[in-house]
């Protein structure tokens, strides 16, 4: 199984830690974020991985080389000249990912022990075009799903803005979830990107919202028996670090 790890972020919310290193190499529980993600993917059967790099990307290349790619096939998608954001980053590596099978996308600043293989199998069984890991957490922006767990919109609860055009959030008919930074994508989504004219630098969430009325984009809630942390900011990094020091494997 194939996976893409997003490691091109600037890590502005982790300064001063990221003044001299890329976000993906900031340590949590004594190991770089990226190492946690790679080892989790490897343990779950994802042994063909591509990692995008941008800010201080040469440090990530050196880190992987020093660890012999952790014994699996790891390639680099070099975005050092221009970061392409999440959607553009996926499209850039389409040739690597597009072999007729779904692939998993994992943000490097998500620390979790969820069942990635199970998420992948659920995606296949549901015949989805994309399956997004989602959870309940405080944020202003939510993805909106119907009671069949199919994406149908987005809302900013602070401003009331809703997407796509014509969508109207109804709490009785919809559930609001926050995106969990991990998703499984089928090659059909890449076809939608190309046919709808998406190219260059773009975020994946606006793309999902643009195709949610014709593509099958599903949500999969985080298992409450598993841990999940967004460690992209200082306070949550410290929380995750404390958790790992006390976590019994």
Annotate each language-model stretch with its function.
Residues 10, 108-110:
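Active-site metal-binding loops of divalent metal-dependent hydrolases
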Residues 102-104, 111, 117-124, 137-138, ...:
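Catalytic-core segments of class I nucleotidyltransferases/pyrophosphorylases
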Residues 2-28, 42-44, 222:
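Glycine-rich N-terminal loop/short-helix segment of MobA-like nucleotidyltransferase
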Residues 2-5, 31-107, 118, 192, ...:
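Conserved N-terminal catalytic core of the sugar/cofactor nucleotidyltransferase
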Residues 10, 21, 56, 80, ...:
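A generic "binding-loop/recognition-motif" signal
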Residues 126-136, 141:
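A short, conserved acidic/glycine-rich loop-to-beta-strand motif
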């Amino acid at each position: 199984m194939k996976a893409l790890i997003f490691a091109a972020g600037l890590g502005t919310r982790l300064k001063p830690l990221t003044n001299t290193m890329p976000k993906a190499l900031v340590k949590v529980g004594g190991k770089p974020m990226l190492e946690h993600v790679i080892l989790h993917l490897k343990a779950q059967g994802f042994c063909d991985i591509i990692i995008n790099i941008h800010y201080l990307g040469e440090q990530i290349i050196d880190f992987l080389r020093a660890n012999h790619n952790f014994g699996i096939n790891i390639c680099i998608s070099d975005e050092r000249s221009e970061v392409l954001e999440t959607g553009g980053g996926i499209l850039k590596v389409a040739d690597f990912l597009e072999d007729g099978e779904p692939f998993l996308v994992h943000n490097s600043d998500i620390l979790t022990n969820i069942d990635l293989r199970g998420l992948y199998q659920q995606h296949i069984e549901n015949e989805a075009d994309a399956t997004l890991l989602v959870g309940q957490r405080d944020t202003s922006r939510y993805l909106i799903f119907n009671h069949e767990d199919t994406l149908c919109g987005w809302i900013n609860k602070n401003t009331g803005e809703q997407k796509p055009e014509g969508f109207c959030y109804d709490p009785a008919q919809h559930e609001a979830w926050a995106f969990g930074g991990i998703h499984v994508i089928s090659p059909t989504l890449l076809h939608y990107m190309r046919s709808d004219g998406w190219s260059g630098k773009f975020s994946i969430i606006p793309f999902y919202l643009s195709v949610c009325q014709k593509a099958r984009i599903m949500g999969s809630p985080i298992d409450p028996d598993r841990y999940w942390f967004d460690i992209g900011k200082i306070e949550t990094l410290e929380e995750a670090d404390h958790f790992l020091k006390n976590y019994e494997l």
